[in-house]
């Protein structure tokens, strides 16, 4: 085997070991995640929203760990396939590139090496037999050819004279190098088999654990009666608890104070602080990631589709199959007004300069050139209007898909926003509510709504209709005002009456 081929072979073998070691470490992390979850479940009292955050945090950590395991095993499998391919290529040229042939040619002056060559052939066969363990038929053929080749080489070597000193040096050098390398490889192979068995057992145990234990604490307390077993199915179970603490007859502050007092008596305050920190960290990271997806992902998808697919296709379709340059009468009116604005100054300049009789042909050429430029400009505006309409539809479709597919993330975001809002002081809460309501439904908000609606209509290629804009401005802010007042009266007044009092004081 050539040196570079052996180096490639060793590199793939090291890749096998590294990828399997990475998967093994990730499987060890699964055990720690399960222990942490069991510890929090048995020692800490949570609300329903906190339990859902813990479950989502545990599921996220498990998904990340499983991704590392499966990716490492895929890398392991690919490296193993390349090793098999290299072994097949090497087996074709085995006689030409045999290590035994290289050694015999190098030590052609040695004699009486029958025993040493037998040891060498056995060691080499053991190595190649392991590398070709999946192809037993090919391994037998390889062993027969190797034995036959070694036997012929021994018979040829016995015909020449060798001394005992060279014989002993060759035996010691060959046996030491090959024996040390093989023992190291075999130890690695045994270690890899042990790691594969551990990973398989861990994954099977994880599936069982997720099916029976990764739910809210009240599920583990259900009795294993036949009635409960028939009526409760873990596979069809869905978590429907809200992401925040619902208000009831007893205020949340009292229930939280009692829970914390009980935890202090049990001596578990340190674990509570650690768990609350992890839960808050997960909620913040998950909420920020989801907000980033809601903001940037629709824009990136629509922008990419517009640049790579929509814009070239729409330009080709519009310029080839459409004879008109405008989409509706509003754009036609704007095009005619633009043409009049171009023609009138030109005619006026020529009349004032008294060159109308002598240069009427030049005037027509200038008007024709300006008209062509206007046609190109409004043709491009029509194409851009179609693109804006399609990209807007893509953005709304992407947002809808994110809302539908990310219900759990949305519930965590809702819980995080409410917790952040409730952690503010009463003055800051009232200020935030007052600022938001004044921006949307305040005294100066109708003019802002008119600008927003008019710009949106022009962006989509529609006419600036004052009646539609006035109707929208007169109804939509009123609906927002009604919803905000109902929320303040129904929800905020029950949670914190001091916020409502501060809000009314600041509003007056």
Swiss-Prot record:
What would be one Gene Ontology cellular-component term for the protein? chloroplast inner membrane
Record keywords: Antiport, Chloroplast, Hydrogen ion transport, Ion transport, Membrane, Plastid, Plastid inner membrane, Potassium, Potassium transport, Transmembrane, Transmembrane helix, Transport
Superkingdom of the organism of origin: Eukaryota
Where found? Answer: Plastid, Chloroplast inner membrane
What chemistry does it catalyse, as a reaction equation?
K(+)(in) + H(+)(out) = K(+)(out) + H(+)(in)
A single GO BP: potassium ion transport
TM helices/strands, residue ranges: 66-86, 282-302, 386-406, 433-453, 468-488
Specify the protein's topology with respect to the membrane: Multi-pass membrane protein
According to the UniProt entry, its GO molecular function terms are:
antiporter activity; proton transmembrane transporter activity
Q: Which InterPro entries match?
A: CemA
Q: Which family does it belong to?
A: Belongs to the CemA family.
> What does this protein do, in the record's words?
Contributes to K(+)/H(+) antiport activity by supporting proton efflux to control proton extrusion and homeostasis in chloroplasts in a light-dependent manner to modulate photosynthesis. Prevents excessive induction of non-photochemical quenching (NPQ) under continuous-light conditions. Indirectly promotes efficient inorganic carbon uptake into chloroplasts.
What is the protein name given in its UniProt record?
Potassium/proton antiporter CemA
- Native organism is Anthoceros angustus (Hornwort)
Supply the source organism's classification: Eukaryota, Viridiplantae, Streptophyta, Embryophyta, Anthocerotophyta
């Amino acid at each position: 085997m050539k040196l570079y081929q052996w180096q490639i072979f060793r590199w793939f073998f090291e890749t096998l070991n590294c990828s399997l070691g990475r998967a093994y470490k990730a499987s060890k992390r699964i055990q720690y995640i399960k222990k942490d979850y069991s510890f929090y479940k048995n020692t800490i009292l949570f609300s329903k929203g906190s339990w859902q955050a813990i479950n989502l945090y545990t599921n996220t950590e498990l998904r990340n760990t499983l991704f590392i395991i499966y990716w490492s095993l895929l890398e392991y499998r690919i490296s193993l396939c390349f090793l098999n391919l290299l072994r097949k290529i090497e087996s074709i040229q085995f006689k030409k590139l045999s290590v035994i042939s290289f050694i015999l040619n190098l030590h052609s002056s040695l004699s009486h090496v029958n025993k040493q060559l037998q040891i060498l052939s056995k060691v080499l066969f053991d190595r190649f037999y392991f590398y070709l363990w999946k192809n037993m038929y090919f391994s037998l053929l390889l062993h027969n050819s190797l034995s036959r080749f070694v036997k012929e080489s021994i018979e040829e070597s016995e015909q020449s004279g060798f001394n005992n000193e060279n014989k002993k040096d060759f035996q010691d050098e060959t046996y030491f190098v090959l024996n040390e390398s093989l023992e190291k490889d075999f130890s690695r192979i045994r270690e890899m088999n042990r790691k594969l068995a551990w990973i398989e057992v861990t994954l099977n145990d994880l599936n069982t654990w997720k099916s029976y234990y990764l739910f809210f604490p009240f599920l583990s307390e259900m009795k294993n009666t036949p009635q409960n077993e028939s009526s409760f199915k873990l596979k069809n179970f869905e978590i429907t608890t809200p992401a925040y603490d619902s208000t009831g007859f007893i205020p949340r502050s009292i229930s939280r104070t009692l829970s914390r007092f009980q935890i202090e008596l049990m001596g578990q305050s340190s674990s509570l602080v650690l768990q609350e920190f992890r839960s808050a960290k997960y909620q913040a990271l998950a909420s920020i990631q989801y907000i980033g997806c809601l903001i940037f992902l629709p824009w990136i998808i629509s922008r990419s589709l517009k640049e790579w697919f929509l814009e070239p296709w729409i330009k080709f379709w519009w310029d080839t199959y459409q004879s008109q340059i405008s989409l509706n009468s509003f754009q036609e009116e704007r095009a005619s007004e633009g043409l009049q604005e171009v023609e009138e100054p030109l005619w006026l300049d020529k009349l004032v300069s008294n060159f109308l009789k002598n240069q009427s042909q030049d005037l027509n050429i200038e008007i024709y050139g300006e008209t062509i430029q206007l046609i190109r400009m409004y043709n491009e505006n029509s194409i851009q209007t179609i693109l804006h309409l399609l990209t807007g539809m893509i953005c709304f479709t992407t947002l809808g898909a994110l809302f539908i597919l990310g219900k759990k993330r949305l519930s965590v975001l809702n819980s995080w926003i409410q917790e952040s809002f409730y952690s503010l002081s009463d003055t800051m809460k009232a200020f935030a509510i007052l600022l938001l309501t004044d921006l949307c439904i305040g005294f100066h908000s109708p003019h802002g709504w008119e600008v927003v609606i008019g710009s949106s209509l022009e962006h989509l290629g529609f006419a600036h209709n004052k009646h539609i804009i006035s109707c929208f401005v007169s109804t939509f802010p009123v609906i927002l005002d009604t919803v905000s007042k109902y929320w303040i009266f129904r929800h905020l007044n029950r949670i914190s009456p001091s916020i409502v009092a501060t809000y009314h004081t600041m509003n007056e």
